[in-house]
Regions:
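Anion-binding alpha/beta catalytic cores of soluble intermediary-metabolism enzymes, centered on
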Residues: 1-154, 159-164, 168-182
Length: 182
């Protein structure tokens, strides 16, 4: 029923609510329902986090398990487009990694650096992109102060987080849910 509302133009967004992920995704991914396009489909979640001054997007925690660089660019573009649809004029996206420095033993940091560089030279998404950056630096100006890290959007300026993979994103959102209930 919700899919029909979206495909006929009477609705703009699907919300999962308390449905199991499989039950939510199966009709979404079914090509005959008409939601899929030529673009890579990814999931964007908006969350209210204690101590964070605005809603924060997180992607992708549901569809792309371990995105390659091309898929990561599509996820960034999808997230930026979703935020723009919600009224964010120039979304600021953080490419989350375990650490904020490029480390050749951590491929996610290298990929984040490459994506930020590519976005500066040949923009592929309508957003500002920063990374690699660890989660504590995304959320906390105090963490930046303690680590002597300079980021203009830390502590409330980021509009979204692009996680390294589905496991990182899913773990992060579940921790948000648990802490929000306490």
């Amino acid at each position: 029923a919700a899919i029909d509302i979206i495909t006929c133009g009477e609705g703009d967004i699907l919300m999962r609510g308390n449905l199991p992920t499989r039950d939510f995704l199966m009709p979404v991914l079914d090509r005959k329902n008409g939601l899929r396009t030529e673009r890579l489909m990814s999931h964007v979640s908006l969350a209210s986090i204690p101590e964070y001054p605005k809603l924060l997007a997180l992607s992708d925690m549901t569809i792309i398990v371990n995105p390659n660089p091309t898929q990561k660019k599509a996820i960034i573009k999808n997230t930026a487009d979703a935020l723009k649809a919600f009224g964010y004029e120039n979304p600021k996206l953080a490419l989350m990694a375990l650490v904020e420095n490029v480390n050749f033993h951590m491929p996610d940091t290298i990929e984040a650096q490459r994506l930020v560089s590519e976005q500066k030279q040949h923009p592929f998404a309508d957003c500002e992109l920063w990374g690699p950056i660890a989660y504590d630096l995304i959320i906390s100006k105090e963490a930046c102060r303690l680590k002597h890290y300079d980021c203009p959007w830390s502590g409330g300026g980021f509009d979204g987080i692009i996680a390294q993979n589905l496991i990182a994103a899913n773990t992060l959102v579940k921790s948000w849910l648990i802490h929000a209930q306490q």
